[in-house]
Amino acid sequence: MARDYYGLLGVSRNASDADIKRAYRKLARELHPDINPDEAAQAKFKEISMAYEVLSDPEKRRIVDLGGDPMENAAASPSGFGGFGGLGDVFEAFFGGSSASRGPIGRVRPGSDSLLPMWLDLEECATGVTKQVTVDTAVLCDRCQGKGTNGDSAPIPCDTCGGRGEVQTVQRSLLGQMVTARPCPTCRGVGVVIPDPCCQCVGDGRVRARREITVKIPSGVGDGMRVRLAAQGEVGPGGGPAGDLYVEVHEQAHDIFVRDGDDLHCTVSVPMVDAALGTTITVDAILDGMSEIDISPGTQPGSVIELRGQGMPHLRSNTRGNLHVHVEVMVPTRLDQHDTELLRELKRRRSRDVAEVRSTHAAGGGLFSRLRETFTNR
């Protein structure tokens, strides 16, 4: 059964174009989503918008007057090409429009997310930190409280698009006429205009301002990680809900420690004599203060001592990484006569030990000699 488009607008079948437009504008002022957020009103607004679209088009109105419904075919084939499936999408991509009506985007929309870089040193990443930062962002207009209007004035449906937020154009192609829908240039797709806008925000419902935000960084964060602060981003147009603020951590290089995930690496220099005889040194760990490390006798250059659980805290648990201490053996560059004599004596003693080992192997008493005799019967 065909819809009663005249009844939806409350006009007679003999109504003029001006009468139809006047009736639609009166109903749109009451039912537009930006004016009346009730769900029933929104459904009614869609119906009267469809009725106005039909009756304001001479060809579609002629079909109605003959007892037909021009929107039934449109519902069966929203792309305008019936059984040709996605052919309408091809023409949409080619011509930059669409024959399907999308409706107004709404004046009140969510705000954008914001990204704030923050530089932290290794200690702050390890312990966590709370900082006050200043951001330049979009905030709610305090004069109109986001309405965008001046005083008691209110938005009204756009005359250009009739509150639909889009205008339709007819293009001729080799396959015939194509009806494409584009955002209305007057209301920019919103569907309403503000005749008396707020003098502070000029109808946008928000203004640019600098504001202080408290940022709490948890312990264990690392370079490139982002901390999300819900609803701390930009306020949306028309006083819409604010987006989120993302704080991106940039970790500064440390003078002593190199970070590898939750593990830390550092290098300590140990005198040659201490490496040979053994000693105890102290390392200033990030969270544990001064830690004592035992250097075993005979420690070689490049040795790594692992201190478990003394690295960085894990972001989402109570565990910690390890501290890896790389030993660098320092060889003295300046020796007095006494030091030189001591080292030469040590060299002679070590040389005798090496000679004794070699003579043992030459006499056949070595391990490899015995193995050779076993497998070769020599």
From Swiss-Prot:
Record PROSITE patterns: DNAJ_2 (PS50076), ZF_CR (PS51188)
Highest taxon in the source lineage: Bacteria
Obligatory cofactor(s): Zn(2+)
Localization per Swiss-Prot or TrEMBL: Cytoplasm
Mapped CXXCXGXG motif repeat ranges: 141-148, 158-165, 184-191, 198-205
Residues involved in Zn(2+) 1 binding: 141, 144, 198, 201
GO molecular function, one term: zinc ion binding
The entry's keywords: Chaperone, Cytoplasm, DNA replication, Metal-binding, Repeat, Stress response, Zinc, Zinc-finger
Pfam families in alphabetical order: DnaJ (PF00226), DnaJ_C (PF01556), DnaJ_CXXCXGXG (PF00684)
J domain: residues covered: 4-68
GO cellular component, one term: cytoplasm
Binding site for Zn(2+) 2: 158, 161, 184, 187
Subunit structure, as described in the record: Homodimer.
Function summary: Participates actively in the response to hyperosmotic and heat shock by preventing the aggregation of stress-denatured proteins and by disaggregating proteins, also in an autonomous, DnaK-independent fashion. Unfolded proteins bind initially to DnaJ; upon interaction with the DnaJ-bound protein, DnaK hydrolyzes its bound ATP, resulting in the formation of a stable complex. GrpE releases ADP from DnaK; ATP binding to DnaK triggers the release of the substrate protein, thus completing the reaction cycle.
HAMAP family in UniProt: DnaJ
Protein name according to UniProt: Chaperone protein DnaJ 2
Species annotation: Mycobacterium leprae (strain TN)
